[in-house]
Amino acid sequence: MNPIRKIIHIDMDCFYAAIEMRDFPELANKPIAVGGDAKHRGVIATCNYAARQFGIRSAMPTAHALKLCRELILRPVRMDVYQKESQYIRSLLTEYTDLIEPLSLDEAYLDVTESTQCQGSATWIAEEIRARIYQTRQLTASAGIAPNKSLAKIASDWHKPNGQMVIRPEDVSAFVLDLPVRKLFGVGPKMEEKLGALNIKTCADLQRYSIEYLLQKFGTMGQRLYELARGIDNRPVNPERIRKSISVEETYPKDLPNSEACLAVLPDLMARLEARIQRAGKISGIHNLFVKLKFNDFQQTTIERVMDKIDLIVLRQLIQEGFARRGMPVRLLGIGIKLKQENTYQSVQLPLLDL
């Protein structure tokens, strides 16, 4: 019988913004954001909690953020600095386990099931890691401790900033009952809306539906919903995880009737893609661009082109070519980049979006 796993999710608090406030103390307690210049149609990569009180969030166009908060202090992205801090923190984590799965520069999963550090207590390990990060880097981190990855990630967000939460194995069944379905991995606003139409607001509501019904209603996602609603997630912490692509997509409440409508929403998708790329940090370089369209008959097409940078004109062309394949209203539109896989560990910084 396999031992109950001890999974920790470490999530740095407002990582980029926190580094800016540490390096420039005069910014403390002021609303600040890290991102691109509004004059060049930049987007917010992250912001501190003071800025979030104004409704500012990551992936928001900088121009809109400045309208929400005229006092917002905009800092340029210093990716080399953030990467250096991330590397230091990563090296610290390796003192506790070799089973580390980085998700981005500022978060990672740790499997400490077999660790003998801190008398084998995952709770104490998380506390010690957070304390050492603050003592050595003057940065705060939040942590979630649970028997699996999904619950650990949910827990790390529970007492942010600078807090941690433990979900014990014996408490999982009770914990998930009142958990809003929007907290589940893969449940975005659109899926939450679909579940809400079935009067599913919590995991307890979701548990009332059979696996057969959920599979019929939501396809493969139905299996995932069935398991997550019961606190089940058997995915291992994967140290060899290599990112192959970065993408964003949106399912629209009203179908996009023509290619012009698809092109009209492209700037928003590009802003979100840029923010996601910035969050990923150092990557191995771009191999190609791709566009995905799902039509209102649920048929799907993907079209791509070899490119070493993101180009708005090329994305517009791909959307037009993809739409022409069926010429029907589009219910889902996505854009993304595929990454070079050779020399993965000789990664280079992503060039800025070519607008």
Curated annotation (Swiss-Prot):
GO terms for cellular component: cytosol. Binds 2 magnesium ions per subunit. One of its GO terms (biological process) is error-prone translesion synthesis. It is found in: Cytoplasm. The active site is at E107. Coiled coil: none annotated. Its main location: cytoplasm. The record marks Y16 as: Substrate discrimination. Its cofactor is Mg(2+). PANTHER family: DNA POLYMERASE KAPPA, DNA REPAIR POLYMERASE UMUC / TRANSFERASE FAMILY MEMBER. This is DNA polymerase IV. It comes from Legionella pneumophila (strain Lens). The gene is dinB.
